[in-house]
């Protein structure tokens, strides 16, 4: 079944309308694995998400829904109007705007910083901790692939975590604050896709911003702090980007295992290797 027809069918069921009442407008920019489409039903525009293959392995949908309810009053997200915790299918009010990946982000760094600070400085408590080490352990069970290089880097990361970060304060983090999850609206930047939200050190969200090019995260860090970051602060961002590289290494390996490279015409094995090399590079930079 073609994607637009599938979206039409699922959205009609979710909104309890006829399929012909669902107008499929276009696919949204963003993640490769999920299907997220811009649709219209009886004159109202929405986004509708269908989870891709294995997508629910990596996310607890009940926790995602709880966090969406918790952050609702902050006004950072588009309004969720339908959520199925079993399938992960979700509908939300459509927010007109420009995805940050499609424009030069530099003029918007202050707005990005303010958006993250609004979340980090809120008194809100997320539904769960991000569970860094436990998350890596879980993701490994989906691949059973732990190369010597991966295990060495993971152990080095855990050692650094226990020595320098384990007891640092945590805040409500989005945990996937990359530019593809940010939309420049008329009066604000919207932070979308809260699948991974939870307690974490604020540096984690800064690190996520460097998913295309790591140095972008260091630019955001200076704006966030309102001054030039110290070497230790820069290394904290590198530390969490190193974790993210190890995490996405395992996710990419899983996608390769289940045949998504062929389905999506993208080399996830190459991506997994790229993430592992990034983790190695960042660790060497931290150690100087």
Feature annotation, model-predicted:
Residues 19-26:
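Conserved N-terminal boundary motif of the eukaryotic protein kinase catalytic domain
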Residues 53, 97, 189, 197-199, ...:
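Activation segment
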């Amino acid at each position: 079944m073609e994607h637009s027809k599938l979206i039409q069918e699922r959205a009609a069921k979710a909104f309890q309308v006829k399929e012909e009442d669902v107008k499929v407008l276009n696919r949204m920019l963003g993640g490769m694995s999920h299907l997220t489409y811009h649709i219209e039903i009886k004159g109202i525009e929405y986004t509708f998400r269908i989870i891709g293959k294995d997508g629910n392995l990596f996310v607890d949908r009940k926790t995602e829904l709880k966090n969406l309810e918790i952050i609702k009053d902050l006004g950072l997200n588009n309004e969720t109007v339908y959520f199925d915790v079993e399938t992960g299918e979700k509908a939300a009010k459509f927010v007109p705007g420009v995805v940050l990946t499609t424009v030069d982000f530099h003029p918007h760094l202050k707005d990005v910083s303010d958006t993250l600070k609004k979340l980090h400085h809120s008194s809100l408590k997320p539904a769960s901790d991000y569970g860094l080490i436990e998350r890596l352990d879980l993701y490994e069970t989906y691949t059973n692939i732990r190369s010597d290089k991966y295990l060495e880097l993971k152990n080095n990361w855990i050692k650094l975590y226990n020595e320098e970060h384990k007891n640092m304060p945590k805040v409500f983090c989005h945990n996937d604050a990359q530019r593809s999850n940010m939309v420049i609206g008329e009066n604000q930047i919207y932070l979308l896709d809260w699948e991974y939200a939870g307690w974490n050190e604020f540096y984690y969200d800064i690190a996520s911003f460097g998913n295309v090019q790591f140095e972008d995260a260091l630019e955001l860090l200076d704006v966030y702090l309102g001054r030039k970051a110290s070497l230790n602060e820069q290394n904290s961002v590198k530390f969490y980007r190193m974790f993210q590289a190890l995490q996405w290494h395992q996710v990419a390996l899983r996608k390769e295992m289940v045949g998504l490279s062929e389905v999506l015409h993208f080399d996830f094995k190459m991506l997994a290797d790229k993430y592992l090399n990034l983790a190695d590079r960042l660790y060497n930079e931290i150690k100087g």
